[in-house]
Each structure stands twice: as structure tokens, then as C-alpha cells.
Amino acid sequence: MDISYIFVICLMALCSGGSSLSQVEGKQKSGRGRGSMWWGIAKVGEPNNITPIMYMDPAIHSTLRRKQRRLVRDNPGVLGALVKGANLAISECQHQFRNRRWNCSTRNFSRGKNLFGKIVDRGCRETSFIYAITSAAVTHSIARACSEGTIESCTCDYSHQSRSPQANHQAGSVAGVRDWEWGGCSDNIGFGFKFSREFVDTGERGRNLREKMNLHNNEAGRAHVQAEMRQECKCHGMSGSCTVKTCWMRLANFRVIGDNLKARFDGATRVQVTNSLRATNALAPVSPNAAGSNSVGSNGLIIPQSGLVYGEEEERMLNDHMPDILLENSHPISKIHHPNMPSPNSLPQAGQRGGRNGRRQGRKHNRYHFQLNPHNPEHKPPGSKDLVYLEPSPSFCEKNLRQGILGTHGRQCNETSLGVDGCGLMCCGRGYRRDEVVVVERCACTFHWCCEVKCKLCRTKKVIYTCL
């Protein structure tokens, strides 16, 4: 009886074919909520008040996975940088979308993966931006914290100072006489990039299209931070002359990264799973020789073949000067040797590890080893800095708490604008109300020695427009 029942079930599954697979994908999309629990650390308190042992606090402990807790424990001081990065991502997201129907609100939502609401359950453009901006903020915050000395396991990036004298001469001047030197304290983008991968991408195994979407957008956020590294210099000489310049690499202001990601949001690429790959429930990895694919180097890092993840300069910086970081299974990965770091020759290589740990390491790096296909076959595949999404965004016009949509009723709009912040688009055609309000502001401020600033209180009338 049992055998016959099993046979009938199997026969029904075979007959249903692709429809069954579509139903499985639908359940995975609409099943348990998406999002990342670690986002909840943004609500645990001020970053400057975070102590290294606070990872054991129940409020923080519940928002982190086991691997994330281990990374926090093994890198003292990193928790404060993570909290700062999470808050940086929220504030930048709200700034970029302050004039949009969806304004990245976190006010009415709980902590953890629901910090941004249930919109993250949908694979839409807004979700892609959330993942990219949070990943970028962690990379930026960790890299800056290393140069500020607040994380015990990392320092400034001294890899540029280890370049050969010939390379410095070529970079310094055409005549071969160097007029500047590497010095100062460069922001440690290598450590920030690698730590962000290990921490942010925890739980994203790349086994289905949604996880691949998350991984791609996380990588895009990190790539934008890395691409905006800039060289800063300081002159040294008598009477203000610039006889010699000392230069270092500095992260750009995070507003620049936010602006770039917002531009990518507007031009995001919709991707899909093809019928030939639907049975695998994910896009198949691209062969190392395929255009736009990656290969895994001997040190376990992803090496792009055609700029899928990094450019040549970024690839050189990450693969040749990877700082020390405590990873899963406590295997540090390093290619640059400092007195307080283990020798690169003594480090186990990813391909040399045997048993379960070796297979796990291989799976971890293979999750970045794919190429997403555009929904429209006439469009080119997304690049390393492009954002990708799976489904169209909702209108965000009407309140729908079930989907995490607050609506635009009561939102202020710009009556003279024809853009997305204009009353026509913001109010979804429902109309708007004109009100005159009296605003009290500080004005006519003067400085009095010493040391006080005195201001007057001025009342001004302003006209505001509010969506019905």
C-alpha cells in the first residue's frame, strides 16, 4: 500500500513538470521572510557606546548568526564599526529616497530582518538598493575604523608602501624622479571588503535566484566603495613649498557612494531564471573560460576574467595585498607580511584543505561564480556595479501593512516639480492640500567673545503641500 502510494505521488510530480518547479519557486519567494537579521544592530545604541563584549548582549546576540558572532568576537572593536555602518546605511538610504514614494522608512517596523519592512520579501528594485547600501556601508565603516585604530585585528593599509621603487618612480613623474612618496595612513579597503563578504554574506549561499540576487547586489555595493578610493597628498617643504609630497589612499565620502548606487538603482537590470536552468533552482555557474566569468585563485579569492567584479587595479590591490582577517574555521588569509601577521607561506590555501572544511570553502567561493541573465534578451548582462532585481516594484501609493507599504497619504510634495517629488506623482493623482504654516527659526546669529553664539528667533510663513 505504501509503495503504491509513493509511486502515484512520483507519477503526479513527473506529469506536472515545470509547473511544479514554478510552484516551488513561488513558495520560496513567498515563504519565510527575507532580509538580514544583522540589520537590527542599528537599533542597539550609539556606536561610540558599544563595547567589545556587548556581542553577548541578548539584544545583539539575537540579531547575529553564529559565524557573525564569531567574527565579532575574534575582531575586537568591530562591533562599534558595524553599528555605525548599519546606521550610515539607513541614513543614506533615507536621504536618497526622501523625495520618492518609498522613502526607506524604518520608523514603524521592528528590528532585525524586518527593519525596512516587508518590502524585502519582494525581489524588487528597492530591495536591491537596501542590500547594496548596507553592504557598502559595512565595507566603508570597517575600512575607516581600521585606519582610525578602533579595530584591534587590523591597521592602516601599508601595502602601497611595499611597492617596488621602480613602480613608484613611474607613478611619480615622467622623468623617473619621484616627487611624492607613499606614506600616511591609508584606509584599509582590503580588510573592509573581505570582512564585509564574510559578515554580510553569511546565510546567502547562492542556491536560488533570490540569494544570487542578494549576493550580486552586496558585491555591487562593495565594488562602488572600492572604486571611489582616492589618493590624497600633503606637501612637505620650507615656507609652504611642495618639495616632497606624502600620499595615501582615502575613502570617498559615503554620500558619493550613495549617489552612485542611487544612479544604479534608476538603471537596475531585471534578471530571471531561464527554463533550461529552472530545474536546478538556480543559475548554473559560468565556466572559467566564459566571457564575464570569474575563476578562483590559489588563495581562494575570486579573480575576474573580464571585469565582472573588479578592475585590474582593484584586483591587484585585493589579491596582492590582502590584510589579515580571521575567517570561518579560524584560517587567516593574507598575502602581505607584517611583523604582527603570520607569514603568507604558512597559511593554508583554499584548494589544499581536505575533508568537509575544504568542500565548505569551495562552496563558499563558488557562490560568487555565476552570471545573471537579463529578463529582456536584448539587454546586456548586468555588470559588477549594476543592481539587479527579479520583479517590478509596487506602486507604493496606498497603505498595505501586509506588504510593508506605508502609502503616500500625508506626505509632503513639491507643487512646482514635474519629477518624482512633484505632487502629481507623489500623490498618485489623488490631489493635495495647500496649507500655510508659521515656522520659528534661528536667525541673525552673531559670535560674542568669548565664546558664545547668540541668535534671534524669527517667524516666517511657509506654504506646504500635503498629499490627500
Swiss-Prot record:
InterPro entries: Wnt, Wnt_C, Wnt_CS. Changing residue 104 to S: In allele wg-IL114; temperature sensitive lethal. The keyword Lipoprotein applies. SMART domains: WNT1. The keyword Membrane applies. A lipid is attached at residue 239 (O-palmitoleoyl serine). Residues 1-17 form the signal peptide. Disruption phenotype: Accumulation in the Golgi, thereby preventing secretion. Glycans are attached at residues 103, 108, 414. This is Protein wingless. The gene is wg.
